[in-house]
Amino acid sequence: MQKKWLLNKTNKDFLDYMSRETNVSSITAQVLINRDIKTPDAAFAFFDSGINSLSDPFELAGIEKAVLRIQKAIRNREKILIHGDYDCDGITATVIMYEIIKNLGGGDIVEYFIPSRFDTGYGFHQSAVTIAHQKGITLIITVDCGITAYDAVNRARELNIDIIITDHHEPNRDENNNLYTPKLPDAYCIINPKINLNGSNNSPLSGAGVALMLGLALNSGNLEKIEDLIEIAMLGTIADVVPLTFDNRIIVKEGLKRISKSQRPGIIELIEISSLNSPNFKTDMFSFTIIPRINAAGRMGDANSVVKLLTTNSHDEAKRLAIWLNDLNIERQKIESEVLESAISQLKTISIGKAIIIADEDWHEGVLGIVASKMVDRYDMPAFVLNIKDGIAKGSARSIPNFDILKCLKHCSNHLIQYGGHKQAAGLKLEAIHIKAFTDCVNEYIVNISKESDLITTLNIDYNVTLKEINHELMSEFSRLEPFGYSNPEPLLGAKGLVPSNLRVVGRNHLKMRLAHNGSVIDTIGFDLGESISWINSVKSIDAVFTPTINEWNGNRTVQLNIKDLRPSNGKN
């Protein structure tokens, strides 16, 4: 699908002012402005933000009440359960909360529980409450889940178990009352940045981030008490693709600094088995190495063992668990490849509407989210990938950048048993006999209710440059904007009238070539752009959208362009 190129522009006088006052190039100044950083003070705060810039945790509603209840439980030696989730964010949030309570003197009274994807599925359920009651637990703290767990919370109240919900997912809203009034479980207290009566969302923390803030509050704001947990919160924050702004950016920035020096056996062994040996860790390194391994446990087996891996003080145990996790991830990759191939084959036999909605009885439930993501990347449209078992279809939905998948599911909720998630990623369950009706509903929603622009991938270009302007000095300026991620993407640049040469396809359909302009020449790589080679060979010059990166090879550091899109040159903006 063709992408729309949109060039961001700013008044030249203001751009020159920001460039001069912050002592950066006009290119970097424009990137700052595009990230809504529009004063020199805001720019310097962005450049220099560190652990001491974290928000006051007591700004989060419900946190003071939670602190008092947890302190009381530790004082009175009540049994406490940390109830997490089986993805990386939920696992790391569990680790944080478990270790915080242990370090506060609750080591003999606290335990944790991660539900199975294949038994109870996502979330906080009545079955967990029943087991907790049988163990004599009187306080349950949920992390990364619970905001819609009405039945489980009601059952806990009947059994005199207090529930503290810490979550970051969207609550249900009472449409009959007010769009912004959340419909909440009757818990002892709830900590969730998404609960705000004016509908704003000033603190888009991950589940691990919320747990870290509660841990900070339990330690009266003493940052030293949570320093060794920042690397754990970083993994959850990167994994859940929350906006890398404000506290999230600080957590990731500080975590990247600290994780290479980690004293935690589980982290040391995960870095070793993932072959991570760079002196300068970047967010995407973890997205493709450690995080998939952590997620593999929840996708393929028992995620409780990952909590053990990340909390053990034994290097031998950590090594054993890291090897187990790595083997599990290899198995996950094999199954994922098989399901992806099957899904692509199925698409060739059906008529595709405005979204991909496919199901099969043989597809492993644990890899459906990854396959859905790859469907989105390949076909540039929302994707719903489902497994059918005993008449129930259950699976994952993934979306393109501008399309809110959660709103779509809400519109079609009368066909669903259950759904939940975020704008870009969600889970759903429905009776298999309703898949056709659900498919029709999704297509109807896209055609009649969503905006046409929602389905067009837009490349927001920060600045049009010449190749001469792309140098190590510019890359040094860009490094001050890191860490990059959702809502703080790598600078996206454009250039026109480029002459291609040395074209070749490498790896799995990746395009390698050199681009030249006015005497400047630069190497490029375009992932999944190998098919473009035929039309590029038929034109004299091209326009390109790209992110500049540093390529390190044999001790040399050169600037390389990561191509995002190409078109024949036409001289227009």
Where are the regions a protein language model picked out?
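Hydrophobic helix-and-loop "lid/oligomerization" segment in the mid-to-C-terminal part
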Residues: 2, 8-139, 159-160, 177, ...
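Histidine-centered active-site/metal-ligand motif
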Residues: 168-169, 364, 422, 510
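Active-site cavity-forming subdomains of large catalytic enzyme subunits
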Residues: 130-208, 212-219, 228, 245
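Mid-to-C-terminal polyanion-binding domains and interfaces
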Residues: 68, 72-76, 317-321, 327-358, ...
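Short, well-ordered strand-loop elements centered on a beta-strand within folded domains, enriched
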Residues: 182, 187-190, 391-399, 522-525, ...
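Short alpha-helical basic/polar micro-motif
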Residues: 209, 369, 373, 544
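Catalytic domains of riboflavin
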Residues: 1-3, 481-482
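A generic local secondary-structure boundary/capping motif
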Residues: 153, 179, 199-202, 277-278, ...
